[in-house]
Structure formats: C-alpha cells, structure tokens
Amino acid sequence: MKKIAVMSDLEMGGGNLTDDFISDLALSETIDGLKEERGGCELIFNGDTFDTIRMPVLRNGIATHPILLDAESACRKLDLVKKAHGPVFRAIREFCLRKGNSLTFVVGNHDPELIMPEVQKHLVRLLGIPINKVIFAGYCYRKYGIYLEHGHQHDVYFKVETEKAVSRFRQTEIAHTPIF
C-alpha cells in the first residue's frame, strides 16, 4: 500500500530577511527517509510550501515587493528559494526519481502563484523531475478518500474564490490573493 505523507506551512523563502525557514537539514533527512518506503510514497505539500508572498523581487537591482502576483516574478522568487534551500530541492528530486513515489502541491496563501501553469512548469524544471511525477492539485486534494486543503480557505480574510484565482491585468496573468 502506498504511504501518504503530508507537510504544510514550510514557508521556504529566498534566504533574505523575510525567510525564517531554517530546517533544511531536518526536512531533507525526513524526505530522504520517505523515499525508501515500500510500495512507494506520495508526498503532499499542503500549502505554503514557499513564501513567495513575502519575498522581494529584484528589478533593476532594487528589491521590490510587487502588488500584482505575476508568473515572471514568482519564477524569479522560486529561483531564489532553490538557491537558499538547495538541500531540500535535492531531497525532493531524489524522492521523486524513486519508482512509486510522487509529489503533490496544494496552493496556500503564501504561495498563491502555484495555481499558474507557467509557475508550475518552472518549479518542475527547478526540481529536475519528470512532469508525470508531480500533481498540482489547486486548492484541495481529493484522493484515496482523503480531503486536504490549506487552512486559508476557512479564513474570511484569506479565502480565495477558486474560480477567480487567476485573471489578466494589462496583458499579464496574475494570481489573486484577498489581501490585495
């Protein structure tokens, strides 16, 4: 039987002052342990895997916090996350390359751009894994009789209307978050 492991609220940032994730070694070792499960393992990151919402983006050498959550900025932020948390990315890659293992992401309020296909493709490239090893479940996970969603969907201030999660603004696709 396939094992299911769920992790939430890691909030890995870009290694700057807003990044308070300091558990690279512990998380890497945990993921390394999961890759050996008999029958395979599905690792589910149930929201806030990354903390893109608090990360600045460098534009012309200046750190800015864009109000609009566009895919280009999110991809730049994920590049910084990988640089800051390389051991975790390595562990996820090795986990996914094992037969029977798979990875699932649920969108959280700290990483709302994960709903965007361009950001998803970029993350898969950064992880160095085959696309068929990862599922982007959107705002909820329903499988094996299990239902998961990130807690922000029950918070009046952070709940996202899933049918309005992405829109266009001046030719740019943006992810919605209720705080803007």
Feature-to-residue mapping (PLM):
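Extended recognition/assembly regions associated with phosphoester-bond processing machinery
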Residues: 1-180
